[in-house]
Amino acid sequence: VKACNHCWELEDKGLGSLRYHFNRSYAYDEVVKATNANNFFIPDLKLRYIDIRFSNKCNLKCVTCSSGWSTAWYGDSVQLGHSLPSEPKLKSIENTDNLLTQIYDQIDNIEQIYFAGGEPLMLPEHYKLLNKIIDKGRAEKIALLYSTNMAKLTYGKWDVVPLWQQFKEICVQASLDGSHSRGEYLRTNIKWDNVEANIERLQKEVPHLNFNIAPTISWMNSYNVVDLHREFIEKKYITVGKIHANILHNPPQYALYKLPKGHLDALVNKYNKHIEWIKTLDAPDNLKTMDILAFEKVVVYIKEGLESKVDNHKEETYSIIQANLDKLRKVDFFNIFPEFADLKNKHYYE
């Protein structure tokens, strides 16, 4: 299966993979032995790992996101005609109290919890669960993993830092797609100074923090993501081996293949130069290889697109969809991303 190639490639190079991680972390012989062979029923289920997303409540309205994943997007979505005013803004688990009760019953068994959203650090249910775990004396036995936008570490009466200090492990995968003004455009409502301040606070106050960045690469941030990675390593916000890059496929108007051939060629050159820079870093080879593979997979994706690319200029990269969104939000994409000045369609600015 083609989708499995990334894990196999990592393992062929002697590195860990998500496949290997799950097979190693969640291999419980007693579960296999207790499972009924006829209906796969487990009479005394003990949950070790939970992946939970309580709702779509979020403080950001990222360009490539939608109201289904962020409540902050709802107003723009209605104005643009993407959502009906009658549709619910908040999409959440139907009976949160019942779910929490079921999770509370499993606290003595849980080893790891993955929180995503929405934005998990602004969900009251998330804080209720952490406090319950602490009250039961289980925090030192449980690792927490987050996908968070790093916009804030506090919400209402809660501050996540003193809670995290009590848990066994804290792994953060920061959803950051760009830096400075580009980052603020891509993840609307975020303030870059706050992001850096939050990272620095965590480094000081949560010493067992495992901090990673997990950018989603679209054509818009395709140049800047390299600068983001290098800046974060040079500022010691991350170490080598701490980038988990995802290639955007949807919404399709933001996919990498929308770029003209000239830009795709330039990106291959930029990424290859960045890979050479990674090789010079003072870090273990296995960690450097992880970062190299993260960028090499983008190069491969671009080259595959170049093979079938027909540059007839009929297909616009900066679409009317994006132009309408920028007008609504009163931002000028080309002022923030001058590297794409050649893509500007004056018709959209009349």
Question: Where are these predicted regions, by residue range?
Answer:
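Alpha-helical packing segments of well-folded alpha/beta enzyme cores
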Residues: 1-3, 50, 99-102, 129, ...
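N-terminal pre-core extensions flanking Radical SAM catalytic domains
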Residues: 1-90, 106-107, 291-350
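Generic marker of residues within folded, mature protein domains
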Residues: 42-44, 136, 203
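Core AdoMet radical
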Residues: 47-57, 68-95, 108-124, 136-156, ...
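Short, well-ordered alpha-helices that flank and scaffold nucleotide-derived cofactor binding pockets
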Residues: 67, 131, 135, 234
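Leucine-rich repeat
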Residues: 100-106, 131-137, 161-165
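Distinct, well-ordered alpha-helical segments
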Residues: 127-131, 155-162, 224-228
